C-alpha cells in the first residue's frame, strides 16, 4: 500500500528524476523511494507517463532539493542584442536575468575559478576575440571566510554598487568613442565606483575588488562592441582583454589633450600685440601654439595664422593690416620679420628721446652780437623766464621811481629811453644817457 501511494504521488513531486535512482543506491530505512522488484514494471509505466506529460507541458516544474539526485546543469544566458536598450535604469536580479542584463547586474555570474558559484562564462559579443572560459581577472583570489582577518591586504569595496542607475548608450561608431566614454565614466561614478577611476594624472584612490573588476569588464563589453572600438583600444585589449582601466586612463588623458586643443584655438583666435613685450617673445608664443596643434594632427596654414595675428595688432603695428590686405601669398615668417623691424625702430627711438631733449634745450640760449665788430661783447639773453621775473617796462618803471631824483622830475625819467651802444674803438668809449642836474 505504501509503495502504491508513493507511485501515485511521485509524478507530482519528482518527475523523471527516478531514472537516476536505483534501489541499491538508496537504503530502505532512509529513503521511501525504495521499491520491490515486483513493482518495477508499474514504476516504469508511471515514469513513462510522467515523461510524456512533461514533454507536452510548456513550463518546468519545481524539483525539491535532494542530495541523492543529480543536480541540473545551469542554463546558459543568451547573448544580448547590441542595440539600444529600452530599460531606463538598473533592474532587480530576477528581472535582469529575464531581460539579459544579468551579465553586469550580477558580476559574480562571470565566474572564472573554483570559488565562483557558476561554472559558465557568458560572452556577450561574438566579435570579442576572447576564449570561452577565461582565466581569473586577478592573480589573487578572495580568501576564505575564516582567513579574512589574517590577510588585510585584499582590497575591499567601500560602497555597494548602486542600483537604478541610468546606463550609458551603446557605442554606434568608432568616431563617437571619445564622447561615449564620457557617459560610461559618468555611469561608473553614479554606480559608486568613482574612486577606482583614474583621474587626470592617472592616479586612483584605491584598488578595485574582483567583483568591481568583473562589473566594469562586463558593462564595457555590453555597451561597447569590439568591432566599433578605436584601433588603440583594440591594441590594449588584445594584449590584456580585461585591462579596461588602462583604456579609461588613456581616454582621460586624451580628454585633457582635447581640452588643450580647445584652449590653443581660443588663444590663437584672441591674439593681441601692441609692442609691450618683445617681438621675439610674441613669435615664440605663437609658434608654440601652432606646433602643439600640429602634434595633435591639426595643421594651421600660414594664411590663417597671419590673419589671426593681423587682427590682434594695435598701436604702431596696426598699419600692417593695410599692407597685408591685398596680399594673397602670406608668409608667417615674413610677418614676424616686419613686426620685429617695427619693434626695433620703436626701441631705438625710445632710447634717443632723452638726448634729443637735452640738445634742444641747449639751443634755446640765443646769442646776439652787433655787426661790423671785431672784438664784441656778447649779451646772452635767456628767453625762458621764471615765474618771479617781470617785463622790461616794469623793471624800468621801478628803477625810475626808486631813484633819488624821482621826486623832482618823475615824468621826465619815465619818458627817457634806455639804450646801450657798443663802439669798437681803442678807448672802447660807451655813451650813456645824459641826466639833468638840478
UniProtKB/Swiss-Prot annotation:
Subcellular location per UniProt equals:
Cytoplasm
Task: Report the GO molecular function annotations.
Answer: RNA binding
Coiled-coil residues are: none
Q: Where is this region: Disordered?
A: 1-88, 366-397
**Some GO term, biological process aspect, for this entry: which one?**
viral translational frameshifting
Q: Where is this site: Cleavage?
A: 397-398
Regions of biased composition (Low complexity) lie at: 369-381
UniProt keywords (A-Z) are:
Cytoplasm, RNA-binding, Transposable element
InterPro entries for this protein:
TYA (IPR015820)
What are the boundaries of the region RNA-binding? 295-397
One Pfam entry for this protein is: TYA
Q: Is rRNA processing tagged as a keyword?
A: no
Which GO cellular component terms, listed alphabetically, does the Swiss-Prot or TrEMBL entry include?
A: cytoplasm
This protein's source sits in the domain of life called: Eukaryota
Another remark in the UniProt entry says: Retrotransposons are mobile genetic entities that are able to replicate via an RNA intermediate and a reverse transcription step. In contrast to retroviruses, retrotransposons are non-infectious, lack an envelope and remain intracellular. Ty2 retrotransposons belong to the copia elements (pseudoviridae).
What does its UniProt record remark on the domains? Answer: The C-terminal RNA-binding region of CA is sufficient for all its nucleocapsid-like chaperone activities.
The UniProt subunit note reads as follows:
Homotrimer.
Q: What does this protein do?
A: Capsid protein (CA) is the structural component of the virus-like particle (VLP), forming the shell that encapsulates the retrotransposons dimeric RNA genome. The particles are assembled from trimer-clustered units and there are holes in the capsid shells that allow for the diffusion of macromolecules. CA also has nucleocapsid-like chaperone activity, promoting primer tRNA(i)-Met annealing to the multipartite primer-binding site (PBS), dimerization of Ty2 RNA and initiation of reverse transcription.
The name this protein carries in UniProt is Transposon Ty2-OR1 Gag polyprotein
Origin species, per record, is Saccharomyces cerevisiae (strain ATCC 204508 / S288c)
Organism classification, top ranks? Eukaryota, Fungi, Dikarya, Ascomycota, Saccharomycotina
